Amino acid sequence: MSQDKPAKPADAADRRFFKRAWVRTRRTLLLALLPLFGVGVMLYLKSEMIVLGAEAYIYGYPLVITDVTRANAALTLGPENQLRRVRQFPDASFKDVVRPNVDTLYTTAFIDTAKGPWVFEMAPNDQRYEVMPFMDGWTNVFAAPGTRTTGTQGGKFLLVGPGWQGQTPAGLTLMQSPTQMVWLIGRTQTNGTPDYGVVHRLQDGITLKSLNDWQSGKPEPSVAWQPSTAKLVPPPMQMDAMSAHTFFTRLALLMANNPPAPADGPMLVKLGRIGIAPGQPPTWSLLDGWSVSLGRWIADFTVGRELKKPRDTVRGWSTPPAILGSYGTFYNTRAVVAMVGLGANLPADATYPNTQVDAQGKPLNGSHRYRLHFGPSELPPVKAFWSVTAYGTDDALIDNPINRFALGDRDPLVFNADGSLDLWIQADRPSPDKVKNWLPVKTNSSFLLNARLYWPKDAALNGNWGMPAVERLE
């Protein structure tokens, strides 16, 4: 029976062979790892560029997306410095603005204050609630004439830009924008489609003229204009596709005429450290540009994480921050709102509780049926009106067979005998006794609910009142 022999020790030649092989292997590994090591060193050396690039992107996002929205509007809605009176509600095909409302008809305009001064006039209106917020390029509301602030008697206002030092004519109230670019997003209460005639007359009582035309008594100008037939990319998608160099170049140029607020001084210092200043686009080296680009993607991730992380909720509903429309140096909040709710009102004019979950914290989905129950004394506390709107995951209205996108206090809702109210939220048509209170959603699709409280009472703003939980029925 044979036996295995012990292995023969390697001789000197074998040892030299293995030594040379190890040297070659080590050299190959070092050469392979050297680029990674070099990248690590470069990342370390450019870490400030990366971090500041992220901060700068979050800081500048609202100004740039507002300008992108302005450019789109000039092609699809009408020229600058001319009011556009929206005469009907949006439908499910509307994608220009995230979470559009179907409670009001808009009167809007992008206004270039450098071509002013401008006179904005509102006729007396004691029939419908209205609010006319003027937003600067950074998405802060600097004036909001309307029912809450100026009453029902209307008003005449002189709109000017930064640095204007002229004399305000008698009879006009001064509104001075801190930026050259101004966006008016006026809203007039509309009680369903049968109310269009009344609201159209009220809209026609809102005018925008140059000061010279107003003083000479000329009518509101009407510029011949043909909307673009091209399918435009929505502003958020344009922002996603924009390179870091294009973004920061646009930001620098915009800041020349839309100056940052005085409180933004420390941020301007940071921008300067990565080669960005008002009116001065960046001229980066390849490595610096790559570093800032990485920072931009980190910023996208940061904001995306901010959007996804759990909010402080009451019965599943979260309420936008009290600084909405007046952000100060809360740049993260300002950027998040610009991404998901560009053009939001001041909380005193409207507040927007929203939810994506039911009472058990499970995501809302059209594969289930839900009930939203308001007790007899639990209806939204408002001085104007309230509604609840359903949106898909794309933040657009949900297509449905009855073209109903919201329910609210101006609808012919059916109340229970005790004065309570049930809203039925589901994809399939409910029984006939529930149809008037039915808010349709899409089968097997996730959705969210957005309440709107116009001219909310204090209880809705200080936390003494909150929306009821969404009850899953099956």
Cite the ranges covered by each PLM segment.
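A compositional/structural signature for long, glycine/proline-rich flexible linkers
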Residues: 2-474
